Amino acid sequence: MLNMVQSNPKGVEKTASKSEQDAWTLASARLLYDLPFNDLLFEAQNVHRANFDPNRVQLSKLLNIKTGGCPEDCGYCSQSAHHASGLKASKLMSLDTVLEEAQKAKDSGATRYCMGAAWRSPKPRDEPAIAEMVKQVKALGLETCMTLGMLSPDQAQTFAEAGLDYYNHNIDTSERFYPQVITTRSFDDRLETLAHVREAGIKVCSGGILGLGETEDDRIDMLVTLANLPTPPESVPINMLIPMPGSRLEKASPVDPIAFVRIIALARLMMPQSHVRLTAGRNSMSDEMQALCFFAGANSIFIGDTLLTAANPGEDRDTSLMRRLGLTADTLDNHA
């Protein structure tokens, strides 16, 4: 098995468009996932080096531009109106505040600015304000990303015309396990939004969360779904659940660190040209665990003290870790 992977690791030669013949299956992905840990990381590092500078990390900053009051019942989220998290709903943030925070993000080394709103989908009355945020943030010299819930084709086109670079809409988990986590929005709804985003010419950011109570096969199957999209996401965020007080999953069991690193490696092997982002949960990861994730192919992180409503490693810790690992921040010229 190892010799086969070394000579032609499934995924390395894949192009953006795939046929049914070379589509991933749970069985083919599981074969890689089950490799001895050292072999899996060796293969992932080889694929990573073939597609990226292994010592550069893309830095993004995430800002919550509208907090709480979301009508969705996502079991992991403190911003859901279904959960007694104590989080107060806010109105849409002003453009001036968004731009002030965007400039701080750029000054900290971020090349992409991600703006998230706790909505099921944007309301028509908010679309002009969102479009203006995109235009003004781009004018600062940053890539833009939005995560606003479901989008219609017209909404995706509106934001594309404003210059939106990326749209984040995670599929969260496997199609099989999805109804155990969310009941107010279907798995197909999520895939439909991703299709609208792609058709509008916006780059796709989509990944999932580990630690929801899913099985290993669910985690792998989530990656199969993403890798088998007509064009895989340009950005694949992999989150480790942060159990939020008041949420339905506040007592969820922690994720095994080795299993988490395996998923990072598998994402790299299955989507070799995508940025794999080490996302939520880094604050509770040891430096050693993060180092393994970078070796396994993660090459993007969110910087800043907070990630929506959860804690994130501060700038000092990230700077120290990157210095000790010999990693440098990516620039737009390097990853555009």
From Swiss-Prot:
Binding site for [2Fe-2S] cluster: C114, C145, C205, R277
PROSITE patterns: RADICAL_SAM
Key word S-adenosyl-L-methionine present: yes
Radical SAM core domain: residues covered: 55-282
Cofactor binding notes: Binds 1 [4Fe-4S] cluster. The cluster is coordinated with 3 cysteines and an exchangeable S-adenosyl-L-methionine.
GO BP term, example: biotin biosynthetic process
Catalytic reaction equation(s): (4R,5S)-dethiobiotin + (sulfur carrier)-SH + 2 reduced [2Fe-2S]-[ferredoxin] + 2 S-adenosyl-L-methionine = (sulfur carrier)-H + biotin + 2 5'-deoxyadenosine + 2 L-methionine + 2 oxidized [2Fe-2S]-[ferredoxin]
Cofactor: [4Fe-4S] cluster; [2Fe-2S] cluster
Pfam families, per the entry: BATS, Radical_SAM
Pathway(s) per entry: Cofactor biosynthesis; biotin biosynthesis; biotin from 7,8-diaminononanoate: step 2/2
Binding of [4Fe-4S] cluster, residues: C70, C74, C77
Molecular-function GO terms, alphabetical: 2 iron, 2 sulfur cluster binding; 4 iron, 4 sulfur cluster binding; biotin synthase activity; iron ion binding
EC number(s) reported in the record: 2.8.1.6
InterPro entries attached to this UniProt entry: Aldolase_TIM (IPR013785), BATS_dom (IPR010722), Biotin_synth/BioAB (IPR002684), Biotin_synthase (IPR024177), Elp3/MiaA/NifB-like_rSAM (IPR006638), rSAM (IPR007197)
Family: Belongs to the radical SAM superfamily. Biotin synthase family.
Subunit description: Homodimer.
Matches recorded under HAMAP family: BioB
Name of the protein in its database record: Biotin synthase
Species of origin: Brucella anthropi (strain ATCC 49188 / DSM 6882 / CCUG 24695 / JCM 21032 / LMG 3331 / NBRC 15819 / NCTC 12168 / Alc 37)
Taxonomic path: Bacteria, Pseudomonadati, Pseudomonadota, Alphaproteobacteria, Hyphomicrobiales
